[in-house]
From Swiss-Prot:
Function recorded in the entry: DNA-dependent RNA polymerase catalyzes the transcription of DNA into RNA using the four ribonucleoside triphosphates as substrates.
Species, as recorded: Bromus inermis (Smooth brome grass)
Protein known as: DNA-directed RNA polymerase subunit alpha
Protein's GO biological process: DNA-templated transcription
Catalytic activity: RNA(n) + a ribonucleoside 5'-triphosphate = RNA(n+1) + diphosphate
GO molecular function, one term: protein dimerization activity
Amino acid sequence: MVREEVAGSTQTLQWKCVESRVDSKRLYYGRFILSPLRKGQADTVGIALRRALLGEIEGTCIARAKFGSVPHEYSTIAGIEESVQEILLNLKEIVLRSNLYGVRDASICVKGPRYITAQDIILPPSVEIVDTAQPIANLTEPIDFCIDLQIKRDRGYQTELRKNYQDGSYPIDAVSMPVRNVNYSIFSCGNGNEKHEILFLEIWTNGSLTPKEALYEASRNLIDLFLPFLHAEEEGTSFEENKNRFTPPLFTFKKRLTNLKKNKKGIPLNCIFIDQLELTSRTYNCLKRANIHTLLDLLSKTEEDLMRIDSFRMEDRKHIWDTLEKHLPIDLLKNKLSF
C-alpha cells in the first residue's frame, strides 16, 4: 500500500494518487485528489468522472456458453455437481483482461473427476484471466466435459433473453464493468477570497484495470465527448474578444482527407495495406472490424463513415491523418508508384 501526504496548492491545478492498494486479485483500490478547484467545480468534476467511470469504461467478459445436448439452463448434467444455470453464473463472474475488439472464441475441455476453475479455460492469445482460481464446476465422475465460449469487449451491463438457441448455446448477462464502485468527497480549504476546494476520488476496480488506468480512460472519454464543442470554426462562429489569444488549430480531418483523395492519382492505394501505416493497435483494430484493409478502402470512407465505426474515437481520427500525412507525401511519392 502506498500513501502520500496531501499537500494543498493554491496555484496550479494538480492531481495525484494518495493511496493505492491491492486487496485481492479481483479488488484494486485507489484514492486520488484534484486541487485547487473553485467553489462548485469539485462537484462538477466529481459527478462527471463518477458517471464516466461506471458507465463508459470498456471491459472483456464471457458472453455466451454452448453445451452439448442440454435442453435448458435449469438442466443437470450427470457427473456434475452444479446445474447448467450455476455454471453460467460462475462463468459470468470470471474477470478477463484484454484489449481485443469483436468476438473471440474460447473453450473448456476436461476429464473428471476434478474441479474446473478459470485456469482450465483455453483462451485466445490476447486474453488473460485475472484470477485463475475462480470456480466453474465440480466433476464428480470420470466424464468428458466440454464447453464452447464466446468472449467480447463491451461496456455496461448487457441483459439478454434467457433462452437456449438452436445450436445449444446460452447467453450470459454480460457485465463489462471493470470499475466496481466510485465515491467522491469535497473538502474546503483557505480563508476569505482564497477559499478553494479539494476533490477526493475513490475508485475500486475488479483487477482487469488499475484505478489509475480506469481514471485515465474515463478522462479520455470525457474529453472526446466535449471535443465537438471546440469546433467553432465549422459552425462559422467568430470571437472577436479572443482574437489576441492563442488558440490551438482545430483538426480539419475532412478537408485534409479530401485533398488526399484528389491527389491519389499515380499511387497504388489498393496495394498499400493499413498494416504498413504504423497505426496504433487500437486504431488498427477499429479499421479491421470495419473491413478496411487497404489505403484505398480508407480513402473511400467519409468522415461520417469512420465515426460510425464501433469504438472509433476522435483521437483515432487524428492519428490516421497524422499517419497519412507522414507516409503519403514522403514515402509513396518519392518511390513514384503508379497504378
